[in-house]
Amino acid sequence: MTLTRIFYCGLLLVILSGCVVQSSQLSALTGLFKSPPVDLSANSWSVRYADYEAIVYAVTVPEGTLFSNKAGDQILFDGWSIRQVKGMGRRGLGYHNTDNSNQRTFMRGNRKIAIHSCMAWQQQEQSSMKRFSQQCGDREPYVNSILVAKDGSIALIHQVVDDRYTAMTLTKLN
C-alpha cells in the first residue's frame, strides 16, 4: 500500500510540474498587455486659479480640449472659452458656463450664480503673436484673453471662470 501511495504521489508531482508557470513566461504574458509609457510633456500646461497652481495635460475630446491631471483637476476649453472647471485643490468645486448672444451664464450644478455681459472677441497683433481679447462684466469689468503663437497654437488662456471674478490662467509649458 505504501508503494502504491508513493507511486501515485510521484505521478501527481510529475503531472503538476508541467503546469508551473515560470516567471519568464508570466513576464512575457504581462508584457503583451502593458502599454509603453507615454511622454505627456509636449502637452503640459501650468494652471493658476486664485492661490492654486498645478500642472495639467491637454487631451482633445469631442467638446474641445480637456486639461486634467491625477489630482482630479479638470478644465474644459471649447476653443474660445473655458466651459467647465472642477477640482483646483478644492473638494466639490465645479463651475460651468454657457453663452447666449452677449450673455455668459455661470452655473454651479443646476444653480445659476451669475450672468455677465460679454462683447465679441477682438484680435490684436502683439509681438509676432495674436492676442484675442473679450470685454466682459457685471458689477466689475474684466477682460478674457487668448494668446496665439505664430504657428497657430495657443500659448496662454486667461479667463474669469466664476461669479467672484476669479481668473484662471493656463500657460503652455513647451
Across the structure, where does each feature detected by a protein language model lie?
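Bacterial N-terminal signal peptides that target proteins for export
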Residues: 1-8
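Acidic, serine/threonine-rich low-complexity disordered tracts
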Residues: 20-76, 81-174
